[in-house]
Amino acid sequence: MAEAVFRAPKRKRRVYESYESPLPIPFGQDQGPRKEFRIFQAEMISNNVVVRGTEDMEQLYGKGYFGKGILSRSRPNFTIANPTLAARWKGVQTDMPIITSEKYQHRVEWARDFLRRQGHDESTVQKILTDYTEPLELPCREEKEETPQHEPLSSKADSSLEGRVEKDELPVTPGGAGQSDDLPGLGTHSDCLQEGPGHATLAAASPSSHNGHVAEDPEVLPQETLVPQGGLWPEASSQAAGEKRAAHEYVLIEEELCGAQEEEAAAASDEKLLKRKKLVCRRNPYRIFEYLQLSLEEAFFLAYALGCLSIYYEKEPLTIVKLWQAFTAVQPTFRTTYMAYHYFRSKGWVPKVGLKYGTDLLLYRKGPPFYHASYSVIIELLDDNYEGSLRRPFSWKSLAALSRVSGNVSKELMLCYLIKPSTMTAEDMETPECMKRIQVQEVILSRWVSSRERSDQDEL
């Protein structure tokens, strides 16, 4: 057997973020005051481990690239804002996301279906949505001192912002195209939009109540009814609890001005088209929350190896032994895959799921934003006599096919053998202490090409 040759990881051509110090040790490169050791919180829901807190999500992914946003490719940065509209309305100073009228109507239809499934009749559903999605006066907000040359946001009867291109342009802040957040300062002035308590009447939740008209329907509905849960309420941390209390999310919808003709709009330039549009402030009837989903191996590594994650099930914290047993019940191969995950993480690699390329793990240097995966890993658990039931018994044909797939994507195929003593029983595997007796052997599989080997011999 020839000795494997180490190949340097292949760096990505474009890197769009800086490397942060990994958990749990804060390095000197982090700016700001030195923070104390932090315990993150997660929940086990439907055999999945999820993190809801916004700050916890950012820290876990940014410092070690743990987990994945359920609505994003990797980093949880989902937003409903339209970047094209944000650039078009760059003169508007707002933290609210700007979306198209079509996207807003999709959310109205989702909310309509949600209310129908709750058993409401069509007239009640229509009344709820009509009151809830009426145009709103712009909430009060303090003007920033660094931009005194611009006019404050005006609130008119039509509750809209007219497009201003040539003069009186309104300033813009980066929040318009970024993550959509609730408006700051709500409830601080008497003439601002007021947020209700945990349960509010339709009159309190309806825009008409702010204009001096009280809705006639006295029915009391929870805010979760008015704002259906597309994801989960972010309630795992104090900051996320504050996000839950802010029951409504406000959006700006780009709508046509009255009297604008489709033929004229199609032939008009962008500047003229913007003059025929307006921004209307409305409530978002169907909010979608993104959370960070951790694999079972990532969750256990954070809880067991780093000790920086507390996992709850039905509001009860789970011990390390209970986590080991619960994850094994959910995923029978968890013990084997976690031992390999723990080993490679301890070596400084960032392991990710390798299902895309038919393997158990992919190994990244630093993280996926910086390097391509170097190795595709197959994991097997054997005894010290190299005997045992294989998780994936390969034939020469299937092994050659997997090797060819890994080679075509510039990755090396690694066979990771976890060797346990022959005296280790099933009872010994019931706790993570069994890992102290496990040995690891790595075998890199490479395809032998006769023509290439012949040319190498001729050169020698």
Swiss-Prot record:
A GO biological process held by the record: mRNA processing
Gene: Tsen2
Compartment(s) where it occurs, according to its Swiss-Prot or TrEMBL record: Nucleus; Nucleus, Nucleolus
Modified residues (Phosphoserine): 403, 406, 410
Keyword Cell division annotated: no
Catalytic activity: pretRNA = a 3'-half-tRNA molecule with a 5'-OH end + a 5'-half-tRNA molecule with a 2',3'-cyclic phosphate end + an intron with a 2',3'-cyclic phosphate and a 5'-hydroxyl terminus
Active site: 364, 372, 411
Similarity comment: Belongs to the tRNA-intron endonuclease family.
Keyword set, alphabetical order: Lyase, mRNA processing, Nucleus, Phosphoprotein, tRNA processing
Segments of skewed composition (Basic and acidic residues): 159-170
InterPro entries assigned: tRNA_endonuc-like_dom_sf, tRNA_intron_Endo_cat-like_sf, tRNA_intron_Endonuc_cat-like, tRNA_intron_Endonuc_N, tRNA_splic, tRNA_splic_SEN2
Subunit description: tRNA splicing endonuclease is a heterotetramer composed of TSEN2, TSEN15, TSEN34/LENG5 and TSEN54. tRNA splicing endonuclease complex also contains proteins of the pre-mRNA 3'-end processing machinery such as CLP1, CPSF1, CPSF4 and CSTF2.
Protein's name in the database: tRNA-splicing endonuclease subunit Sen2
GO MF term list: lyase activity; nucleic acid binding; tRNA-intron endonuclease activity
Region entry Disordered, spans: 143-215
